[in-house]
């Protein structure tokens, strides 16, 4: 009997558990801390705003139950990953496979998530992969198919997770650049904030320019960390633009739109914390990141939105390529 575990009962983690339970495995165990509002809602009603738990999905506040399975998906806030990794390193993790389903960088280090896990998990025979690419829960539940990418520093680990998760609903591709795909997935959230600001200002025509120039900037950041800048044009970054820059379901786009309107979003968004990390590293190492620098001034320094965003597109004239 195939079984997997999921750590994190938020929107995405619960969906991935539901997806696995309905398309790929016989049993899914979902974990969260017992005081988590998401966990309490699922425990009381067996549903959230998006889906109803299948009969083969089980909830637990006990990590011992999670580690009865070898395949574990993690979907929590990126800034809590190191703390979780330290906690679970106290368990016997030999032979375990972890799929990190979040999109972000650690702040302030700007470390990719697989490296955060590798630093804190000190045991042997523990394997890490990451998930990236487009897709919204609302679309998947309508059976709208999509594609995603799974990457790892271990070729066998990519194969392991793709064979476990592949279905007619989600086609998974093998990643070839774990650094580029993790950074690309994280920074698409930042670019989503920029797109939302343009929506809030009703400057829709600049979205095309944003889509053309942002991958160039993200590619620089990827290259700085030893990745392939072309990964910015793959599924994890450019391939996720429709779901992040245009969709009404994008939390990061909504964050930017409401910011431009002088309002606050009640939805969680990973983009702002990733933006902080990018700002620190780009300043320290002299990486040219004009879009991210402008966004930082708007989001964290209270800069005038219209003049700052306009200035971002009025920099010194240069060749496109």
Regions found by a protein language model. Give the residues of each.
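NAD(P)-dependent Rossmann-like dehydrogenase/reductase catalytic/cofactor-binding core
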Residues: 195-196, 223-321
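Rossmann-like NAD(P)(H) cofactor-binding subdomain of soluble oxidoreductases
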Residues: 53, 61-143, 161
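NAD(P)+-binding Rossmann beta1-loop-alpha1 motif at the extreme N-terminus of oxidoreductases
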Residues: 1-61
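Alpha-helix C-terminal capping/helix-to-coil transition sites in glycosyltransferase folds
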Residues: 67-69, 187, 238
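Electropositive phosphate-/nucleotide-binding environments in soluble metabolic enzymes
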Residues: 10, 14, 22, 59-60, ...
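Oxyanion-binding "anion nests"
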Residues: 194, 202-233
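A short helix-to-beta-strand connector/capping loop
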Residues: 51-58, 124-126, 168-170, 287
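Rossmann-fold dinucleotide-binding core
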Residues: 105-204
């Amino acid at each position: 009997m195939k079984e997997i575990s999921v750590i994190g009962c938020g929107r995405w983690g619960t969906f991935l558990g539901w997806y696995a339970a309905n398309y790929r495995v016989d049993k899914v165990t979902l974990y969260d801390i017992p005081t988590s509002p998401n966990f309490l809602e699922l425990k009381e009603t067996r549903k959230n705003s998006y889906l109803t738990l299948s009969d083969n999905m089980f909830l637990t506040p006990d990590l011992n139950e999670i580690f009865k399975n070898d395949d574990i998906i993690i979907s929590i806030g990126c800034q809590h990953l190191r703390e979780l990794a330290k906690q679970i390193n106290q368990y016997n993790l030999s032979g375990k496979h972890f799929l990190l389903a979040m999109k972000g960088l650690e702040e302030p280090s700007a470390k990719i998530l697989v490296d955060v896990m590798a630093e804190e998990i000190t045991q042997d025979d523990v394997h890490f992969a990451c998930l990236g690419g487009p897709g919204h829960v609302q679309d998947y539940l309508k059976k709208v198919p999509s594609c995603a990418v799974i990457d790892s520093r271990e070729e066998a680990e990519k194969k392991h997770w793709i064979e476990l998760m592949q279905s007619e609903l989600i086609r998974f591709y093998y990643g070839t650049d774990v650094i580029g795909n993790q950074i690309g997935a994280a920074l698409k959230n930042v670019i989503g904030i920029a797109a939302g600001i343009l929506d809030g200002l009703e400057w829709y025509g600049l979205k095309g320019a944003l889509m053309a120039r942002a991958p160039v900037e993200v590619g620089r950041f990827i290259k700085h960390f030893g990745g392939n800048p072309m990964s910015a044009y793959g599924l994890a970054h450019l391939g996720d633009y429709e779901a992040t820059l245009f969709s009404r379901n994008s939390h990061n786009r909504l964050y930017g739109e409401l910011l431009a309107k002088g309002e606050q979003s009640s939805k969680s968004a990973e983009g702002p914390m990733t933006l902080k990390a990018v700002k620190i590293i780009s300043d320290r190492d002299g990486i040219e990141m004009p879009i991210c620098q402008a966004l930082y001034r708007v989001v964290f320094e209270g800069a005038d939105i219209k003049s700052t965003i306009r200035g971002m597109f009025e920099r010194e004239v240069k060749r496109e390529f």
